[in-house]
Amino acid sequence: MDTQRFQSQFHWHLSFKFSGAIAACLSLSLVGTGLANADDSLPSSNYAPPAGGTFFLLADSSFSSSEESKVRLEAPGRDYRRYQMEEYGGVDVRLYRIPDPMAFLRQQKNLHRIVVQPQYLGDGLNNTLTWLWDNWYGKSRRVMQRTFSSQSRQNVTQALPELQLGNAIIKPSRYVQNNQFSPLKKYPLVEQFRYPLWQAKPVEPQQGVKLEGASSNFISPQPGNIYIPLGQQEPGLYLVEAMVGGYRATTVVFVSDTVALSKVSGKELLVWTAGKKQGEAKPGSEILWTDGLGVMTRGVTDDSGTLQLQHISPERSYILGKDAEGGVFVSENFFYESEIYNTRLYIFTDRPLYRAGDRVDVKVMGREFHDPLHSSPIVSAPAKLSVLDANGSLLQTVDVTLDARNGGQGSFRLPENAVAGGYELRLAYRNQVYSSSFRVANYIKPHFEIGLALDKKEFKTGEAVSGKLQLLYPDGEPVKNARVQLSLRAQQLSMVGNDLRYAGRFPVSLEGSETVSDASGHVALNLPAADKPSRYLLTVSASDGAAYRVTTTKEILIERGLAHYSLSTAAQYSNSGESVVFRYAALESSKQVPVTYEWLRLEDRTSHSGDLPSGGKSFTVNFDKPGNYNLTLRDKDGLILAGLSHAVSGKGSMSHTGTVDIVADKTLYQPGETAKMLITFPEPIDEALLTLERDRVEQQSLLSHPANWLTLQRLNDTQYEARVPVSNSFAPNITFSVLYTRNGQYSFQNAGIKVAVPQLDIRVKTDKTHYQPGELVNVELTSSLKGKPVSAQLTVGVVDEMIYALQPEIAPNIGKFFYPLGRNNVRTSSSLSFISYDQALSSEPVAPGATNRSERRVKMLERPRREEVDTAAWMPSLTTDKQGKAYFTFLMPDSLTRWRITARGMNGDGLVGQGRAYLRSEKNLYMKWSMPTVYRVGDKPSAGLFIFSQQDNEPVALVTKFAGAEMRQTLTLHKGANYISLAQNIQQSGLLSAELQQNGQVQDSISTKLSFVDNSWPVEQQKNVMLGGGDNALMLPEQASNIRLQSSETPQEIFRNNLDALVDEPWGGVINTGSRLIPLSLAWRSLADHQSAAANDIRQMIQDNRLRLMQLAGPGARFTWWGEDGNGDAFLTAWAWYADWQASQALGVTQQPEYWQHMLDSYAEQADNMPLLHRALVLAWAQEMNLPCKTLLKGLDEAIARRGTKTEDFSEEDTRDINDSLILDTPESPLADAVANVLTMTLLKKAQLKSTVMPQVQQYAWDKAVNSNQPLAHTVVLLNSGGDATQAAAILSGLTAEQSTIERALAMNWLAKYMATMPSVVLPAPAGAWAKHKLTGGGEYWRWVGQGVPDILSFGDELSPQNVQVRWREAAKTAQQSNIPVTVERQLYRLIPGEEEMSFTLQPVTSNEIDSDALYLDEITLTSEQDAVLRYGQVEVPLPPGADVERTTWGISVNKPNAGKQQGQLLEKARNEMGELAYMVPVKELTGTVTFRHLLRFSQKGQFVLPPARYVRSYAPAQQSVAAGSEWTGMQVK
């Protein structure tokens, strides 16, 4: 029995609350009907209203009245959310018509997402009544069952089976999913229906759409992604409402037989209304132009269907339209200004790519533009050039003066530790900032060389390129079994506008891209032939098992220097059957001449060729079929000499579907000429909109009714010819645009009409094309305008061509920069592409989901390697004379390569031009040293050099001279690199020279100075002596070296001497780097001329050290001692920030006040655990930096008061060495606390605060500081009590190179105010071999350059007595040193390659013999024999000449001997700094045993003497420990 068919339908009109009340009443009524014998309990219904789920509803196009309207619904069809929606059974759709569409659209804030508030009802009473009815019916039947006995019921049902109850009363209720939203009463309802969601056919991609390689198959049809048909509707605006459960979305559907095509520019909007099906003009449409907030202007289209509205265009605007039939359309327009006329500054550098430490030359040229063609000189004014590195950090600022005629120029030097990446130049000029860029690449010195020797000097097209690669270590030994990877890219020489250019780089497939070098280090090279003139770029990446690969790029030119021809015709298109004359001419004299022509029809690939007459200049071709043709000229070898494209019109011509082809008859027009444009449509077209555009729509016309600015001729059904007279206002270019619509689609095409702009013709000519290194190159520059000479300002650079292979030119062509082809400022759009959408959300509020983002990693390229000289010449300002001539010369650098000369120029009228030329530096025989220049006394190096030969088996003579001895060697060289061992016995300092002779003529010569230093660790020493006229005894140690004299007569000279010594301190930790920055800043302030060469050097050193500090910074701008991992130290952080502040103040680099707050943030976190001296120093720096620190000072004063005085303070006697560091060695000693007390008193006095420390404690601290031998204590006392230059000089005289750099730097900085500016005291030249040098901070000194050690100093008798400081370097074994309980052990292991790449087995080295071809592991073990932690130390490890530490250990794993098949241990990151013949490892804390491991290579053969490795306390240098025994004090490298 079907109980549900009797249900009432009135529940559709009841709210959810009301239905609940009725259910409660009915339940109560059933309880009271006397059903006492029945089971009154009501079973659960297991019913829940369908929740639904989110989905998207969108209308992705508009529709005409003859089309079926539809909307798209996208629901999740592949996850759990589908099951939440399936039980609803589909999607409820309602379609409404909007009575007043224009008012409705104007009220919307976002036309893409229409907002109409819903009327939410909920689930309703229907399903409640269903359950109640079924439940009551079941219970009533049970009551009736109990009324009769079981036997009676059985008898009745047997007689009348239709009375059997069966499963009717236990069958679950059937529920109906009701629409939970009421219809919108405001809008007429057109129709409503429920559409099957999961059963409907999903949207499929268009036929043939397939993405090759897509693993997710994301374009396959997905359930739930469907179109919902709405039927054909009358023109108007319709609202669609879609509902699933409690989720609802709305969108609008535009129905119109009219399309609005719009063109928006800066202050104007052009609208053309056309028929959607046929594309005819449709007048009488009402148009509103709105920015989404309000209507900016409005109008009605005229008889041609066009309307022009004037208003400033916002970035985004909308067109709301309603045609005469009631159809509604919307168009969205985007506009951005792409052409602005103002000051243009052309900023470029001498080359696009640099290495760290290189000099960068910058040139600035500028004009003030008023329109595309007319400009005036810029205003002469000062400007500031800022340099930002790849991290965005400001490196330096350079003052540049811009001149109206000559522009400006400047230069700067990159820091030696500059990071790799893109750098930005920002020029601040007259309240505007202009930008340019260049790149920096880091280069690691390769541990072997890769040479390329080709079998032929010249290769032609069609010939395979063959040769060999040669891999050699610096000592000439071949790199055996090296893994070599080859990568080849080709750049074809192509004709573009009769200009020979290299096209894009395309990879070339190689059969053997990976190979292995043979026993002689050779790799056979066989590259495929090039079918066209090309430039091959061969990248070679080789590895001998080291942690990094040696990578180099070689250039191979195919048919280099080949002359080319120009090929031209009167028009770029013609009619089919018409005879076309093509003319050709050689651009340069050459033996190659064209003998045949060939054309290729692109549509069907048919071709034809013909012979050219001997000595002819033209040929004629008759094209029978319309289409697009490519014509080429070839020589007798089939080589392409010229090429041209040509279009042919005729019946049957048509463009590709959806496109319009426009071909101009010429690429360049002169004013007064007529531009002919061939227009080809994809189908017969009768109407289109033609416009001329640039900054606005300059002209407009219909295809059916041509305007007076053009003439039109219809050639056939699909082709028209437009003729446009060219006026002066068209220059430099204007856009000719064609726009049409048909069958609900629209298409437009732009074609440029380029008009000639006068440009300088700059020619570069050298007296020859090939030079030898060292030769004088004479360059002639010519500037002309329209064939007549003209004077111009030129900038010329000569750069290694391989730079452009690594990094193409960044600066644009100067002509394209100042007179670029104007960008079209008109944006075209249509109402066909407007999309409205909505996302269905639940009517109940839900918490927002979490955002999921993924990080994109950045991949870095392998580092390349270059030659030493990259810019051979840079002429920033040359002026050609009235004849347009200018000349300059330069010496060809000592490198073999191809050079590019680039000349850029501008004349007084602002016309510009650019020219380019090439030349080569070549030499048949070329030598290069392959040995270090610094050795130790006792070393016996095996000297050698490389000879690069372009010849094969030619006899030569090598003549070498050293220490008065001459040696001659007769050699026979093979082609490529030849390593030659020299016969000289070199064991002392001197000049080594070599000459290479052939047939009695010197082919090449080189020389280098060799130095032999002491074979012990050096120690810097100094003393002050009084010198007078006559002879003065020096009394220096016999082994003294680097002897120098400098005056210390005045406090100013003492100050300069200390400043210079501090700047020369080695190593790069936070302490030393900051300690160099402060004296450098003092030196900068003392300079009178900040543009001098000395100022440039100091500025460069400041930049280097500032960048080093930046690189040492850790997270949160906190610093550790040497940039190691760990939490930042507040004291070191403050020292780094203070040093950076000093440098910034000196150079004028401004920062916001909160920038320096990092310093106090770190202090606030750690102050309670810091020594009092460190706290006082940090606050002294903060006070000097004008940071807020009064509260912190009070806290420090209270801490000192709490300490008071202790018994040990009085009992402890200050016996410390004067060279020991109070700040870093014993910062918690009683003396350090006393110094902190005195310094705090000074700070409180400056801050006008009172101390809480007891007077007797202050007096004790004062006495202890005064009686100390520490320079820091004396400096603090002087700051508190005041003093003069004499007292300051006394403190400065006690500073030595053995003392801590931070204490010396602080003393100099705090005592600098006592140093009045005085001229340097001139120390006369002593008799003998003394050379004069400049001090960093000003002044001069004399250095001994003679042999041995001078005994006496002789001056003229007129010299009055003068204080002089003598500085020298002596061996550590002769200086006073104190040992500390630390054991230093050194062990070398040879790395034996394992089965896997980058895995090695360690083989202990038991003798002093070293293989120069092998890789070694240097293991240093330190063992402290005391319980106390030794802080701030360093291990100094000697190296023989030519040895080097590998920069990285990444990926290398090593196994100890007898480790079996255990997994290798990865090497830790190398942490070292290189010194002279040694490397240093910082050791922040030493307790127990610590081991350091580094990879070493030994390149120089010979017998070498080494001092033992040692451990030194960094800030107590007299405390050290050396390795015991004689092991590793000598090495023999073979």
Swiss-Prot record:
It comes from the Bacteria. It comes from Escherichia coli O157:H7. SUPFAM superfamilies: Terpenoid cyclases/Protein prenyltransferases. It holds the Pfam family A2M. GO terms for molecular function: endopeptidase inhibitor activity. This is Alpha-2-macroglobulin homolog. Belongs to the protease inhibitor I39 (alpha-2-macroglobulin) family. Bacterial alpha-2-macroglobulin subfamily. The keyword Nucleus does not apply. Keywords: Signal. InterPro entries: A2M_N_BRD, Ig-like_fold, Macroglobln_a2, MG2, Terpenoid_cyclase/PrenylTrfase, YfhM-like. Gene3D superfamilies: 2.60.40.1930, Immunoglobulins. Residues 1-38 form the signal peptide.
